[in-house]
Amino acid sequence: GIGSALAKAAKLVAGIV
């Protein structure tokens, strides 16, 4: 769902930063 998408985006951003 949307929550999973947000979690994935957060992980990607955390990896970049």
Swiss-Prot record:
Gene Ontology BP, a term: defense response
Cellular localisation: Secreted
Modified residues (Valine amide): V17
Position of the signal peptide: none
Tissue-wise expression: Expressed by the skin glands.
GO CC field: extracellular region
Keywords of the record: Amidation, Amphibian defense peptide, Secreted
Protein name, UniProt field: Caerulein precursor fragment-related peptide R3
Species of the source: Xenopus ruwenzoriensis (Uganda clawed frog)
